[in-house]
Amino acid sequence: MRADKSLSPFEIRVYRHYRIVHGTRVALAFLLTFLIIRLFTIPESTWPLVTMVVIMGPISFWGNVVPRAFERIGGTVLGSILGLIALQLELISLPLMLVWCAAAMFLCGWLALGKKPYQGLLIGVTLAIVVGSPTGEIDTALWRSGDVILGSLLAMLFTGIWPQRAFIHWRIQLAKSLTEYNRVYQSAFSPNLLERPRLESHLQKLLTDAVKMRGLIAPASKETRIPKSIYEGIQTINRNLVCMLELQINAYWATRPSHFVLLNAQKLRDTQHMMQQILLSLVHALYEGNPQPVFANTEKLNDAVEELRQLLDNHHDLKVVETPIYGYVWLNMETVHQLELLSNLICRALRK
């Protein structure tokens, strides 16, 4: 897939309701599987449906489909083989069969807590389905094994039809996060406010959404073959921006005299507008593709520092505490630097 592909309004709408889309896909897959079972009169017809739901339910993005498909099919086949061996051992010795099943379930539990949890889960599920057959009825066990494999293949087929891309979902979520960040930024530093706004819940939501995006990094990297380090860098900067915004708000509203000085710094306000424009350009790039690097205008920041020094001299009689003022300016400079780095990383992520 092209990483710089422009997102259509329809795609954005679909991906914003991806849980509804995935639920609809699972429902249609269940109905079609049920009709296939009835049409061909497949024995032990419960197990393809059970397997399809177990396998298809957790899969959502295309980056997870292919690797997990092999995990699931491998787990299903191995579980079937272990189950058939267990049924043969039961004819020889029940204690030996129990030891064999215990060893197989130990393998299931061990894999379930490793890098291939779904494979371990399906080994255990398939083993339980197969050994649940009546004693000595190998035909029933074979049908159950085949039904589980059939359910696995159908689940992979339905998941691969119009799959959702984790990379596109990541782009939309990052654009949404930056948009919300811009709104909170404007609300916190609006010159029309007389008192500090209560934005704690909004900041917490920004941080929570940033943490949730980490789950998209692995499948997005597999889909685009873009190194995970780029996604991790964007993730870190996104989280840092939220943390620095909270510190900026604290410094901006620290004391009334210092807030009055910052409020009257015209060049500092110009810097705030510059950062808002950078955020808007990043959001536009994430939706439209083909981004251009953003270079911060550090001269505006230097001019703002000089202006603040003059304002402090003019308001020397107010005994203004300088620490919040210079802390706020430094945080502004660091925020602009972080946005510049974020722009460069987004350009690398949205390359052709």
Question: What are these model-predicted stretches?
Answer:
Residues G74, L78, G233-I237, K267:
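Secondary-structure capping and boundary motifs in well-ordered enzyme cores
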Residues N240-L247:
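A membrane-cytosol interface segment of integral membrane proteins
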Residues M1-A210, I217-A218, K222, L341-R351:
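A transmembrane helix-and-boundary motif of multi-pass membrane transporters/channels
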Residues M1-G23, H169-I234, L247-K352:
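Long, hydrophobic alpha-helical segments that serve as membrane-spanning/inserting helices
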